[in-house]
Structures are given as structure tokens and as C-alpha cells.
């Protein structure tokens, strides 16, 4: 009788797959320092409000904008670093060849979904950036600060989704090349 070894799940790929992934990871690491800036400006707000009884009008919206922007970028970072969510119950239980086909399905479905989201986000960003007559007019928050953060976030969502579509295309090409190379052997 042969002794069976328990199946060990695959380790996530630690290396970016292409130049775009490398750039996203590098830029994301730099932008992650903005989380610290958010902590500092939030601390500033607490000090001003509770020690000097002089609350700010800009900290809450600015901190929310920075945090929201970083979370949007976090989506393309997770995909670039291969840290996205997958159903490991199925993925880890199948052979490496089957994983390649699951990756192919994942990239096809993801490409379709990201493309539809990018298309939808375009109309939201366009409405947030331009008046109905075509003049540039950024949507603002409507608060005392009245910053153009809503328009900037909608534009960032559109850009991030366009990048995600490109990522899916590049990853799909790599998956197809990997299948072709395996089938040729």
C-alpha cells in the first residue's frame, strides 16, 4: 500500500505576472502611505475639536475621500498581486491542470463583468464631470467644504475598472498561452 500525502493548497503567486501588474503594485505601495496621512489628519481633527473647541470643515470629507480612493485602487492591487478572493474549497481540491481551466473561466467571466462595470461607470463619471450641455463642471459634495470628491471618486472608479479590464485581458492571454503550451507537450 502506498501512503497518501494530504493535498496541500497552492501558494498564491507572489510575483506579478506582467509589467502592468508590477506598476500597479509599485504605485499601490507608494499610495498606501496615504493611510497614515489619513490617520494624522483625523488626529488633527480630534485635537482641534476636543482640545481647542474648533472643529474643522474639511477633515471628515478629505479622510473619506482618501480612504475610498485607496480602497478602489486596492481592487486592482489585489488582482495584480494574485490576492483576490477565490473559492478555495473547489480550487484547492482539483489538479493543477483543472486549475488552469478554472483560471480561464475566472478570467473570461471577470473580463465580461469588469467590462460591463467599466461601461456603466463611464456614464456615472461623465455625468459627474460634465454638465448636460457639455461644459466641464465637477460634481461636488454639497457640504460646507463642497469639494469635488464625488466627481473625483467616480472618475477614479472608471479608470480603475478600465485598468482591471486590461489586467483581465493580459492575464487571459497568459492563461491561454499556458494551456496551449501544455497541450503541445
What feature does the model see in each segment?
Residues 2-185:
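Alpha-helical transmembrane segments and membrane-interface helix-loop junctions
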